[in-house]
């Protein structure tokens, strides 16, 4: 890797079982060897995984890593967010990922915060500059946005509210990211915009995720993945090459680093990162 020290970070989701929590620590140890900047931990809505998120944050912090817990608007009150912020600060947590979050089925209200912008603003009001705040960016447009320009304007509002850096939704079209960054810079946004990268491990699962979040899998990739059928080894080898090429183009194009959506697996992300270093 000839570029200057790109950043590296990983996302985990909180395991639902004690066995999963133990496995996550093993995954963490394997990825920690790559010297990432931090690990983010997702946050379940409505209490579904909130306790597990707190447990994962505690365990990963105790293992010596910088951890960035997710905060979401869904069901949150000013008091509940204030309690989380104070608790994380007491643990020495210095970074957060502030998101609107997805409404669970049947939920009609987000709570006291309607948008991630409101959440970012509240964190700054309550905690000053203690936390580095990451927010989401959508190179292929948020699925609920009315237009690319409206989506970019909303992103700029989050930055103006106090965000320090952004992580994108995953994508497989480098041009989408490069165009988004160019448009953001033209709009006066100067914070780092780090591409979020999802390894390709399972076509059915990836298709479901992508349909839900609005991420586009280019047609040529879909056709190749579908043609592998149950040949998972060949599918993953192809997926590895696709993502390595994507990351290489992104870093060459000026991306400040890579944020991996790990699905709590170390091997695929580590292999991609090592390939980029050759």
Tell what function each PLM region has.
Residues 19-21, 47-59, 77-84, 102-126, ...:
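Active-site-adjacent beta->alpha loops and helix N-cap segments on the catalytic face
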Residues 7-23, 45, 67-79, 132-150, ...:
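Active-site mouth loops of central-metabolism enzymes
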